[in-house]
Amino acid sequence: MLENLATTLADTLEGIPVLSLLIIIPLIGALAAFFLGKNNAKLAKSIALAFSFVALVLSALVLIAYYGSGNGGFMFSENYVWVEQLGINYNIAIDGLSLPMVFLSTLLVFLATLFSWDVSEKTRTYMSLMLVLEVGVLGVFMSLDYFLFYIFWEIVLIPMFFLISIWGGPNKSYASIKFLIYTHVASL
């Protein structure tokens, strides 16, 4: 019965750009938390938690559909030409290696958002950065194009720098600069 449910779910999700939705949902949440939570920290937290939960549920559905289908290769593939002259495509998919990382990333962002409920300094910025970080991490794990991978990798570095430099520990300034230097040098 569970196998039939997974197969039905896989068939249902196959025609939907589910992986793009996994990237877009946290991005919309980040924008909503930042702009709608301007004067209300609790609203910003609630928006971030809701959007991270939706991404978690969607990744769980993809996980069930993938492993229930018995497919061992790429699934839910999306490929759109982006810059044809340079051979750059928006090409994303998941496989048995990337899917657990996608699911764990959505789970960790949801839990991090939930357990950082007591953040009181620049709350809307913090919650927005968490969701932008989720966008970048999910893109890194789902990218099949090197240029797209690099873009998502750089997207991860920006919110991480600000999260460390604003909400970090006692040596947050030193740590954030070191993080920025090492990760940017490594990304070249």
Q: Which residue stretches match the model-derived regions?
A:
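Small-residue faces within membrane-embedded alpha-helices
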Residues: I24, A48, T106-V109, E134, ...
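Short conserved micro-motifs on helix faces and helix-strand junctions that flank
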Residues: I23, I92-A93, T106, M142, ...
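Alpha-helical transmembrane segments of multipass membrane proteins
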Residues: A30-F35, A60, F110-L114, V135-G139, ...
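Alpha-helical transmembrane segments of multi-pass inner-membrane proteins
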Residues: L21, I25, A50, P100, ...
